[in-house]
Design a protein with these regions (language model features):
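Gly/Pro/Ser/Thr-rich low-complexity, intrinsically disordered segments predominantly at protein N-termini
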Residues: 1-286
């Protein structure tokens, strides 16, 4: 569980939404790189709505993401690093979205993207992701492009993008496992992106469910969340990977077959083209 990765100094007994906001604001103001995750325990069941309401009046709501575990009365608050994080997330999600919509037979209506949307396993646990890709057949946004046409909370994403800093790789891997396991097969592909700062580099992993055959049992094979592709990009734009391309299978994006179906592919050259402007942006800060 993510809580095991959070230092004790960042764990607090829940008092009130106001107290939570004060602690988060203190962390934001400190700028400390090792304090992007805060753990609150003793959160009463059903209090998330009250917390949301209090956060809506502050400027912090768009800077945090929540993961809850109701059985433990626990809430993990992830504090987003700011403009650099947003630039990395937005740029990659935009490039992915453009490639998806360019698949023959698809348009801008075929896939919806949502930032910070909460997905919920009723009364058990919930999570807010960075960037969710939801097929239009799930989101049912009949009123598109009205921003009020929010999808059903049951419309889980088929694919997720999660982004973090050097300290967050273990958290990102747990994020990938969370989506793949808790979505009951609805989320089929997770891309995690880690911005490393010393030295400056970008690390990308693609996760999916993979069949596992346990040699010690005669039980049917099981599916386990697994990193299926891995890429490291340095400031020169050199991509190190066992793969020649980042491939997102069509069936991981859409639920329905298509005779024109093609996978979404980023060549290593395209990954370089994505990374170099990011490095130029980030180099002014490190």
């Amino acid at each position: 569980m993510q809580a095991a990765l959070i230092p004790d100094k960042n764990k607090f007994e829940y008092q009130s939404p106001e107290d939570m906001i004060r602690r988060i604001q203190t962390t934001v103001d400190s700028g400390s790189a090792d304090e992007y995750f805060l753990y609150f325990h003793g959160v009463p069941h059903g209090y998330l709505f009250e917390i949301d309401r209090e956060f809506s009046t502050s400027k912090l709501r768009y800077s945090v993401r929540f993961t809850t575990e109701n059985s433990l009365g626990a809430l993990i608050c992830r504090i987003l690093p700011g403009a650099r994080h947003l630039a990395l997330t937005y740029t990659l999600s935009m490039k992915i979205g453009l490639k998806i919509r360019a698949i023959p037979g698809h348009t801008y209506r075929s896939i919806d993207e949502f930032s910070g949307m909460r997905f919920d396993i009723r009364n058990i646990r919930s999570k807010e992701g960075h960037e969710a890709f939801v097929p239009a057949t799930r989101s049912k946004r009949d009123a598109w492009p009205s921003m009020n046409a929010w999808p059903s909370m049951d419309a889980w994403p088929s694919m997720m993008l999660e982004v973090g800093y050097s300290e967050a790789l273990d958290f990102l891997r747990l994020d990938a496992k969370w989506w793949l396991i808790n979505s009951a097969g609805k989320t089929r592909f997770v891309i995690i992106v880690q911005l490393m700062t010393d030295p400056l580099a970008i690390h990308i992993e693609c996760w999916a469910m993979v069949t596992s055959y346990h040699r010690q049992t005669i039980k049917a094979p099981t599916l386990i969340p697994t990193c299926v592709q891995l890429f490291d990009i340095d400031t020169e734009g050199t991509v190190t990977s066992a793969s020649s391309e980042l491939r997102i299978p069509y069936g991981c994006i859409f639920d329905e077959p298509n005779e024109n179906a093609v996978d979404v592919v980023f060549t290593n050259a395209e990954l370089t083209s994505f990374a170099l402007p990011m490095f130029s942006l980030f180099s002014h800060d490190f």
